[in-house]
Amino acid sequence: MAGSTIINDTHARDGEQTAGVAFTLDEKIAIAQALDEAGVAELEIGIPAMGREERERIRAVASLGLKARLMVWCRMHDTDLKARSTAVAPSLSVPVSDIHITKKLNGSRAWALREIERKVKTARDHGLEVSLGGEDSSRADMDFLIAAATVAQRPRFRFADTLGVLDPFQHARLHLTAAATDPEIGYHAHTPRLANATAWVTLAAVLGGATHVNTTVNGLGERAGNAPLEEVVVSLKVLYGQDCGVDTRALGAISDLVERASNRPVAVNKSIVRDAVFTHEAGIHVDGLLTDRAPTRISTPPRWGASTASCWASIPARGGEDGLRQLGIACDDATAQACCRGSGRATRAKPPDGGGAARPFHDDACWQAFPAAGGV
């Protein structure tokens, strides 16, 4: 793993392919601007072949003057290349697994190589910087992938795990492709339907030689989704010391923006961007945090745009006192213990709004749940 990984966010393409998700033009513009301001290097902003309205939205985003490099997803069709906006680079997608080439395209490997060579040449003759995307790369023959990258004269090659069949330990397959494309290799992961592992597989791809990776905010995407932008960026920074140029303090606000625009609720304990990730109930954790935060934290919530809190329940009195201080209330041990007992009863009553122990101390809604549950 060398240098800094380039983040290519595809919320406006693969993210919007999530069943039931469609962004308005204003939402697309707001999200693109937020990602650009945060420092995301590349944005995939649509599919020209989807029609006139989609092309108008692409042109609108392209006209914003963003710092990010803009790309669009294109099939290996002359019509797709003609439909793209002049302000964006094409990412040419071609099926590369035998089952796709033969069953979907009724072609052969030799035919696919000829098409790749011809379309890439056409794009370059028009002065375009091309990225070649290999659909279903994870099920393709590695020698064929190298041949495809070679006939395309080694553009960036996007290795797409289209069906989410790779596990993190299979990333070594990328070493050969990385050597063949010299030096740029992109990686696009889809969440396996068996386990949510896209962020880890993407990190493994970086270790295997990927220089560019695809993400979507909140992991939006077809089927079980894509690698979440926030998880990949923060993991690269914390685990591997890689700064992708993204302002991590903006991640929480961007997540909120996309949550509203997509109408897809984000779990309260979603990694990185939700406060519950930094909320503690276990007595040993609360006690440790009040003594010294370092042993129970690899980072601090404000770095990711989140906040920290203790949580009501059967936590020790010391934690209860800390929580009440967050509410601006002074109390003794007995009062703190009584509050904790009341919170436990409120939580067991399963209030419809999820109050009680699930509420951090800084949310006074937990107090309202106490009377019905026989609280303090």
Swiss-Prot record:
Known catalytic reactions: acetyl-CoA + 2-oxoglutarate + H2O = (2R)-homocitrate + CoA + H(+)
Gene Ontology MF, one: homocitrate synthase activity
Top-level class of the enzyme under EC nomenclature: transferase
Domain Pyruvate carboxyltransferase: 5-252
Family: Belongs to the alpha-IPM synthase/homocitrate synthase family.
Function recorded in the entry: This protein is a Fe-Mo-cofactor biosynthetic component.
The protein's name in its UniProt record: Homocitrate synthase
